[in-house]
Regions:
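Extracellular loop and loop/strand-boundary signature of outer-membrane beta-barrel proteins
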Residues: 129-131
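Generic short beta-strand segments
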Residues: 120-127
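Short, low-complexity N-terminal intrinsically disordered segments enriched in polar/charged residues
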Residues: 20-65, 114, 170-177
Length: 177
C-alpha cells in the first residue's frame, strides 16, 4: 500500500467541501434539484387553484400514498392521517368550493436532498356550490414535500385562517374537553 501525503491546504478544502454532507446528513439539492422542486411546486399551485374551482383531482394526484401522509386543512377538525383519510378529505372539497381564484404570497421555500417545504399566504375567492355569494379566505399554509421514486410528492399540508394576532390576555378562556 502506498501512502500519499497531502498538504494542509488540500485537507482544509476537502473538509470544507464535505461539511454540508456531514452537518446535514444528506447531499444538497443543488441547482438542478432546486429547479425540479420549483417546477413541482408550480404544479402544486396550479392544482390548488383547481381545487378552489371544485376540482381536486389534479392536487390529489400530487400527494404521496405512503402511510405517514397528513393534512390539517383550513376547515379545522382533527386532521387527516394516511391516504385513506386524506383522499376523502380532498374529495370533500368539491362540495365546498366552486368558481374560485387563488393568489399566493410565498414567504419561504427550502429544499435539501429529498425534503422541501414552502410557507405561504393564500388569498382565495370562491363560491360555495349552489350559492351566488362570493366568499373570501385568507390562509396561512405550510407544505412539506419528499422526493420519492416517481418524483416529488406532498407529504403534509397545514393550513389555517389568517386571524388577527392575539396575546394570551386577549383570548377568552376555553373549557377543556
Amino acid at each position: 500500500m502506498t501512502l500519499t501525503r497531502i498538504g494542509p491546504r488540500i485537507a482544509f478544502v476537502a473538509c470544507v467541501a464535505a461539511l454540508p454532507v456531514v452537518a446535514l446528513g444528506c447531499p444538497q439539492a443543488g441547482d438542478q434539484g432546486r429547479a425540479e422542486f420549483d417546477a413541482f411546486f408550480e404544479k402544486v399551485s396550479e392544482a390548488e387553484a383547481e381545487l378552489f374551482r371544485g376540482r381536486p383531482e389534479a392536487l390529489q394526484a400530487l400527494w404521496t400514498r405512503e402511510p405517514e401522509v397528513t393534512l390539517f386543512g383550513v376547515s379545522g377538525g382533527s386532521g387527516a392521517h394516511g391516504w385513506d383519510q386524506v383522499g376523502p378529505r380532498l374529495d370533500w372539497t368539491r362540495t365546498q368550493y366552486s368558481d374560485g381564484s387563488l393568489t399566493i404570497t410565498r414567504i419561504a421555500a427550502y429544499v435539501s436532498g429529498n425534503l422541501g417545504y414552502v410557507v405561504q399566504l393564500e388569498n382565495v375567492r370562491f363560491k360555495v356550490p349552489g350559492h351566488a355569494v362570493e366568499s373570501f379566505l385568507q390562509i396561512r399554509a405550510t407544505w412539506i414535500f419528499r422526493r420519492e421514486r416517481d418524483g416529488w410528492r406532498i407529504i403534509h399540508r397545514h393550513a389555517d385562517s389568517l386571524i388577527k394576532r392575539q396575546g394570551p390576555a386577549e383570548l377568552n378562556a376555553v373549557e377543556q374537553p
